[in-house]
Amino acid sequence: MTEFTTLLQQGNAWFFIPSAILLGALHGLEPGHSKTMMAAFIIAIKGTIKQAVMLGLAATISHTAVVWLIAFGGMVISKRFTAQSAEPWLQLISAVIIIGTAFWMFWRTWRGERNWLENMHGHDYEHHHHHHDHEHHQDHEHHHDQGHHHHHEHGEYQDAHARAHANDIKRRFDGREVINWQILLFGLTGGFIPCPAAITVLLICIQLKALTLGATLVVSFSIGLALTLVTVGVGAAISVQQVAKRWSGFNTLAKRAPYFSSLLIGLVGVYMGVHGFMGIMR
């Protein structure tokens, strides 16, 4: 630590900027940075590349902001402040928001399917009742038509549900400010867990009155982190678009994907919450 401090005092840390970018990118590959959760979210909503970039940048911004808040707050509140003491609380808060997001995704998908089925059943009942009144004297033909109608209804269910699902995604996630805020909130939550290494570097720079240098290193670190997170999100968005073009059965699978994605995100939130709670109880 003494040698590193000496290098900072001599101004040699400017040579560390490329290394900080690389370390940030590698740091994004470590567990605990919501890459799986972010990719699952993008896949669940069939997100665009623009939304994937937005999600990754939001996570990076919150990650950097938390580093600054902890560093400055720690210096003001107590000299004995450590990043480890704040991390459990941040994990617990993030877990609550993440689990809430998972529940919202599951409920939105379930409600959409339920409403569609209720509307279809109501329409089928009216159509069957009308058909029964006008063709009651043709018993055999009526029975045959009813069976044929059931088969046709199943085909319409698949096609119409796929169209409804696509329209719902377009309506909810295409250029709507409120939906963009939901994506930003999810990304900001994903970056809540700070990096103790980045906090340590910033604290050292502040103590040595090298605030500009510390800010530059943290920004460089964040650029590397953003490259990783944005790459993960864009990769998920592109993969969804390419698979949909090449595999006709993808739309059928995609109808159930939000359930799996919400479950996966919920498990990540539970895991994060348990670790945060255990850290607080220590």
From Swiss-Prot:
Residues 127-161 are annotated as: Disordered. It is a multi-pass membrane protein. InterPro entries: Ni/Co_transpt_high_affinity, NiCoT_RcnA. Efflux system for nickel and cobalt. The keyword Transcription regulation does not apply. Residues 1-12, 78-86, 204-217, 281-282 are periplasmic. Residues 34-56, 108-182, 239-259 are cytoplasmic. It comes from the Bacteria. Residues 135-144 have a biased composition (Basic and acidic residues). Keywords: Cell inner membrane, Cell membrane, Cobalt, Cobalt transport, Ion transport, Membrane, Nickel, Nickel transport, Transmembrane, Transmembrane helix, Transport. Gene3D superfamilies: Nitrogenase molybdenum iron protein domain. Induction: By nickel and cobalt. Transcriptionally repressed by RcnR. The chain crosses the membrane at residues 13-33, 57-77, 87-107, 183-203, 218-238, 260-280. GO terms for molecular function: monoatomic cation efflux transmembrane transporter activity; nickel cation transmembrane transporter activity. The lineage of its organism: Bacteria, Pseudomonadati, Pseudomonadota, Gammaproteobacteria, Enterobacterales. This is Nickel/cobalt efflux system RcnA. It is found in: Cell inner membrane. Its main location: membrane. Belongs to the NiCoT transporter (TC 2.A.52) family. RcnA subfamily. NCBIfam families: PRK10019.1. GO terms for biological process: cobalt ion transport; response to cobalt ion; response to nickel cation.
